[in-house]
A protein has these predicted regions:
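Disordered regulatory segments flanking catalytic cores
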Residues: 2-4, 13-28, 40, 214-320
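Boundary/activation segment at the start of structured domains
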Residues: 13-94, 101-110, 116, 134, ...
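Soluble non-cytosolic domains of exported or imported proteins
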Residues: 21, 37-48, 69-76, 112-120, ...
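Sec-exported extracytoplasmic/periplasmic mature domains
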Residues: 32-35, 44, 48-60, 83-90, ...
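Active-site-proximal C-terminal subdomain of hydrolase catalytic domains
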Residues: 48, 134-233
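Active-site microenvironments of hydrolase-like enzyme catalytic domains
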Residues: 82-114, 129-170
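Catalytic-core regions built around general acid/base machinery
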Residues: 118-129
Length: 320
């Protein structure tokens, strides 16, 4: 009972009025049904870390799954919050899902208090949302959500590589820590990207099982190219891929590396349109490099020079 009261107080302290459309980047934190008090405390701690980080970053925060006196189910509330989010196109939206998941070989579900939500249903709800999105599903059996929600505008993270990985997932604990962990900052730019946090969390998850002498039963994946396939941390050494994609295109990770919850000082000073243009140029350079073997050398070098000059001029004009 005491835990429930404390959770309600925390939820009320961050809950925004969903009837007001926020013009700021938004984070929706969904806390699923815990089942037992042990998981309730764990999920609460993970959620609190995300909430604290989002507030530090100045995000508009909405929490689903903590109200003790709600007049609607968590499923209804989640849909209402998503409907509201659709009214602010173009602004970053984070969706963090903390809890348990299930998979019956046909459909994956995220367990809520009351009726659950399936991957297919969530995909339908998100169709009107024209915003860059980062969706982090920390539940077991969460991989089918990556397939269902994949889109070029979205970065998707799941605790598991398949719906069959249904044991309790610990990835969420390490992800909630890594998102603001300076030791995860592999490129030393004084900010931890979503990609860097994913790599750190996935490796810490593997270390937990190894130290405990247990078989690794969860393999986190990240998709940011929109193909719904995703990559695992063991396909990279640091930020560098050690495998190639079958189609010759860059592996996932570039777009996720452009997502930062808490930005460094220089990035905070950049207008949104400048950051978006910079990210677009970086994407174009990466895609061009993947085509190096298929283009005439002169054409490749000419295109690369043009993009690099444009990026340098943009950074110089922004004072970087």
């Amino acid at each position: 009972m005491l835990l429930s009261i404390l959770f309600a107080l925390v939820a009320n302290s961050v809950r925004a009025d969903e009837t007001a459309v926020s013009t700021a980047p938004t984070m929706i934190v969904v806390v699923g049904a815990s089942g037992v008090e042990q998981f309730e405390a764990m999920f609460a701690e993970w959620a609190d870390r995300w909430i604290a980080a989002a507030q530090q970053a100045g995000l508009h925060v909405v929490v689903v799954g903590r109200d003790t006196d709600a007049t609607e189910s968590d499923r209804q509330r989640l849909r209402s919050v998503i409907d509201q989010a659709a009214k602010s196109p173009g602004i970053e939206l984070w969706l963090v899902m903390i809890g348990h998941g299930t998979f019956d070989r046909r459909e994956a579900r995220f367990n809520l208090r009351g009726p659950d939500v399936s991957a297919r249903e969530l995909a339908d709800w998100l169709k009107p949302v024209d915003r860059p999105m980062a969706i982090i599903n920390c539940a077991s059996a969460s991989a089918p959500f990556v397939t269902a929600l994949a889109s070029p505008k979205r970065v998707l993270i799941a605790s598991t590589k398949s719906g069959s990985e249904q044991n309790f997932a610990r990835f969420g604990e390490y992800m909630s820590q890594a998102i603001v962990d300076s030791t995860a900052d592999l490129d030393k730019d004084d900010q931890t990207s979503l990609w860097e946090a994913f790599l750190k969390a996935a490796r810490r998850t593997a270390e937990y099982y190894s130290t405990d002498g247990r078989l690794l039963t969860e393999h986190a994946v990240l998709d940011d190219t929109g193909d719904g396939q995703g990559v695992r941390s063991d396909q990279f050494r640091g930020l560098t891929p050690i495998e190639q994609s079958s189609d010759g295109q860059p592996l996932d990770g570039q777009r996720a590396h452009q997502w930062h919850l808490v930005r460094n000082v220089s990035d905070q000073a950049l207008p949104l349109e400048v950051r978006q243009k910079r990210d677009g140029l970086e994407d174009a350079i990466l895609k061009l490099k993947a085509q190096k073997k298929t283009l005439p050398p002169a054409e490749y070098l000419g295109q690369l020079e043009r993009l690099l000059v444009e990026l340098a001029e943009l950074n110089e004009s922004a004072g970087r």
